[in-house]
């Protein structure tokens, strides 16, 4: 009974992580805005920034991995490899969000020391969409951290179980 409950909980978390990563990818890819500054058209898109590209790629990798695990794990084919792959996915998501958040912060606030001006005032639609994507990515990272804890618990419980 307890094993089945853990499996159901992990499956629900995986579907939640899948939803969050897919939303993050779709919203970030569709984020764009343009503004006219001094008779020049300035276009803001996710692929203008390597950090946002990395974010989209990392979230996409996590989505594909999640789909694979949902279908293979139900057949019991992955075993302890899931722990390692969950850890890699958690770290990948965390690093991509960190990079994207750093760029988003510069876009919102600018950097007076480097002479970079904030751009969110000129392209608010892009910034709003990027924030939504980053929130979804953050949710995915939190869910994956919870999945990592569940995976570790599932693998380590039999090792440390007291045998009568």
From Swiss-Prot:
Extracellular side: 30-53, 102-129
Keywords: Cell membrane, Glycoprotein, Membrane, Transmembrane, Transmembrane helix
Gene Ontology CC: plasma membrane
Entry's transmembrane regions: 9-29, 54-74, 81-101, 130-150
Subcellular compartments: Cell membrane
Membrane topology: Multi-pass membrane protein
A Pfam entry, by short name: CASP_dom
Disulfide bonds: none
Glycosylated position list: 39
Cytoplasmic side: 1-8, 75-80, 151-164
UniProt xrefs under NCBIfam families: A_tha_TIGR01569
Family indicated by similarity: Belongs to the Casparian strip membrane proteins (CASP) family.
Subunit architecture: Homodimer and heterodimers.
Protein name: CASP-like protein 1C2
Organism name: Ricinus communis (Castor bean)
């Amino acid at each position: 009974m307890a094993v089945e409950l853990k499996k159901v909980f992990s499956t629900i978390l995986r579907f939640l992580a899948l939803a969050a990563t897919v939303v993050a990818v779709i919203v970030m890819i569709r984020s764009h805005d343009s503004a006219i500054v001094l008779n020049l058209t300035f276009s803001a898109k996710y692929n203008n920034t390597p950090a946002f590209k990395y974010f989209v790629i990392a979230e996409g990798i996590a989505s594909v991995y999640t789909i694979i695990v949902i279908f293979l794990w139900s057949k019991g084919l992955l075993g302890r490899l899931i722990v390692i792959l969950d850890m890699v996915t958690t770290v990948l998501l965390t690093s991509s969000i960190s990079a994207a958040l750093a760029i988003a912060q510069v876009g919102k606030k600018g950097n007076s020391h480097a002479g970079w001006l904030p751009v969110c005032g000129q392209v608010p639609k892009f910034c709003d969409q990027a924030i939504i994507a980053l929130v979804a990515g953050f949710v995915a990272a939190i869910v994956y951290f919870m999945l990592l804890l569940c995976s570790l618990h599932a693998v380590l419980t039999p090792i440390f179980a007291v045998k009568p």
